[in-house]
Structures are given as structure tokens and as C-alpha cells.
């Protein structure tokens, strides 16, 4: 009996594409409005969102689908190329497997780039696009990170780290080394951390760390390298694409943490103008992982926008 249940669970959460297994799972009623969550990366996964937020969002009356992109997280595939087209092909398969004609897509971090480009190519499949702490003008983000950390190290008179900033700035801007260098500096300075953790946020993170999801928090270190090797669109600005999407009938929304320090004020103003002020929310005491930092506000906002 246990073996049958295990097999049933496997069938629910994985499917084969080109001979490889992709992890996915649906939460909620299939007749409810569909939401597909696209995680960050390259080298990310959806375990944090799935463990903390997927079921809670489904409980509000949505059919929430999470998945790990090919070669990332639980979708182990040594032949993955990590291109956008590969991601699009697998996303189309998810639509087919879960019998979805049109979905609301939430794109988080790098997942926002995947979601934006997918929506541009297949607007007929996307009812609305929600950018959640999503990347959109990559070079502006890198410039902001480097400028910000330089100021921090100048105040601290940290000559060693100032030298590190100089080294990163000299790297090829279309390389994985440059991207990793920028985000490593951001991480060292807590750019992704909420400033004043709440009891709720702390509890969510602790529950995640003791869950089965955390045990499968797989990070493929080769993913960024292969993405930059195989994908020509590796440092892009999707603002023109987002403006075009509105003309294609895709509803646009954006939700960002006020203390998500990888985005400049200018970038946030740009995003607000694109989606319109009524479709934009900036959450206080919130950084990059806003669905954990301020989960209640995040879920209420999604419910309000795409109900």
C-alpha cells in the first residue's frame, strides 16, 4: 500500500519531457483560476515558495502550480542547456499536463525574465503577469549593486573589498563571473534580507528549514555558467517587452520589497510607470523574498489583483 501511495505521489509531482523528469506539483482546485509560479535562478528552485506559500495561496481559491526548471532544483537533467527557449518548451508542457489554456504567472527574481519573455511569445496563454521582486533591467541592477557596495566599503574604509569591487567591475558584463560577483557582493551586505524580521517570517523560514522541501533545496552551480554559455539574451532590459505586453492584452502587475536593495529608486519608478501605480505595490520591511518576508500582504495583493 505504501508503495502504491508513493507511486501516486510521484505521478502527481513529476512528468517526463524528452526522457527527463521535471518536478511539478499543483495545489488547490483544478477549476479555480490557475497560477503558475516561476522561480529565480539560474540554479534556483521553487522549494521556498512551495513550502511556505503555495498551499496558503491555493486556499484563497486558486489552482497553484509550482515547478523546477530543467536542470535546476529537483528537475535534475545533465543535458539541460538553460536557454529561455528550453524553459518555454517545458512551460508549455506544464500547460498541457495540467490542462490549462490560460494562466496567471508569478515571476520571482530571474523568473521574472523567464515569465516576461514567455508572455511576449505566448500572450494567448497568459491572463496576467505578476512581477514579484523580478529582474527586468539587469545592467541597471548590477550598476546599482556595485555603486551601493562601493559606498558601503568607502565608509568602512575597507580597501580589500574595494579592490574586490574594482575586480568585478572589470569583468565581462555578459559573463557568469560578473553576475555571480555582483550578487555575491549584494549577499555579503544583506541586500536580500528583510531589515526587521517578524515572528511570522522567522517561523516560516524555520519551518522551511526543518521540512522535507529544504532537504531538496538543490542548487546546480553549473546552471549560471551554462546559461551564459548557451543563451545570447544573458544581460537584458525587458522594459520595452513589458510595454509591448500591454498592447497584447496581458495584464501587468508588480510587487516589490521596499528594502530589496538590488533595485534602485529609478528602476522602481520605471516599473511603476510601466504597470501603472494602481497595479504596483511596494511593501515596507520587505526585501527580495517577499512571499516570506510579508506573506499576508503578498497573498492579499495577489488575491485582489487576479481574482
Predicted regions located by residue number:
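The serine-hydrolase catalytic nucleophile loop
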Residues: 42-54
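Glycine-rich "HGGG/HGxG" loop immediately N-terminal to the catalytic nucleophile
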Residues: 47, 69-84, 140
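Conserved alpha/beta-hydrolase
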Residues: 58-74
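Conserved acidic catalytic loop of the alpha/beta-hydrolase fold
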Residues: 86-103
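Conserved hydrolase catalytic core segment
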Residues: 101-145
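Flexible "cap/lid" loop of the alpha/beta hydrolase fold
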Residues: 131-174
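Short beta-strand/loop motif that positions the catalytic acidic residue
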Residues: 248, 254-256
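Catalytic histidine-centered segment of alpha/beta-hydrolase-like enzymes
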Residues: 286-295
